[in-house]
UniProtKB/Swiss-Prot annotation:
Record-stated family: Belongs to the universal ribosomal protein uS11 family.
Gene name as annotated: rps11
Subcellular location: Plastid, Chloroplast
Pfam families in the cross-refs: Ribosomal_S11 (PF00411)
Gene source species: Zea mays
Gene Ontology terms for molecular function: rRNA binding; structural constituent of ribosome
Name listed for the protein in its UniProt record: Small ribosomal subunit protein uS11c
Subunit structure: Part of the 30S ribosomal subunit.
InterPro entries for this protein: Ribosomal_uS11, Ribosomal_uS11_CS, Ribosomal_uS11_sf
Length: 143
């Protein structure tokens, strides 16, 4: 005789065989490339670094959250530095262009870490979007 299929509303819990920190084991190994583009996106809450090949296809990405930082520590310069080192070490770049976007605190630290890592930088571009008097900015915070 076949087993009865449990209903959606049944009280019996089904355990899935995933560990709590399964995020690190599920990540694919990054392709090794020698030349690429490093995109640094530094917001006021986080720093995200994406490494792409010269055609723009994503090879690897890293953020302060994936490096183990939580809450307000993700916005620190040290988190930006660790994120950059993690991304470059994994991919193994030798020559790269850097495109920096945003005005967060991890921006300069990530740029310094990239420069010290031994990667030959062909150019550093600031691609922060600047409005030509577009939308009204949000109101100032009152603390």
């Amino acid at each position: 005789m076949t087993k009865a299929i449990p209903k959606i509303g049944s009280r019996k819990k089904v355990r899935i065989g995933l560990r709590r920190n399964a995020r690190f084991s599920l990540r694919k190994s990054a392709r090794r490339i020698t030349k690429g583009i490093i995109h640094v996106q530094a917001s006021f809450n986080n720093t995200i670094i994406t490494v792409t090949d010269p055609q723009g296809r994503v090879v690897f990405w890293s953020s302060a959250g994936t490096c183990g930082f939580k809450s307000s520590r993700k916005a620190s310069p040290y988190a930006g530095q660790r994120t950059a080192v993690d991304a470059i070490r994994t991919v193994g770049l030798q020559r790269a262009e850097v495109m920096v976007k945003g005005a967060g605190s991890g921006r300069d630290a990530a740029l310094r870490a990239i420069a010290k890592s031994g990667v030959r930088l062909s150019c550093i571009r600031d691609v922060t979007p600047m409005p030509h008097n577009g939308c009204r900015p949000p109101k100032k915070r009152r603390l």
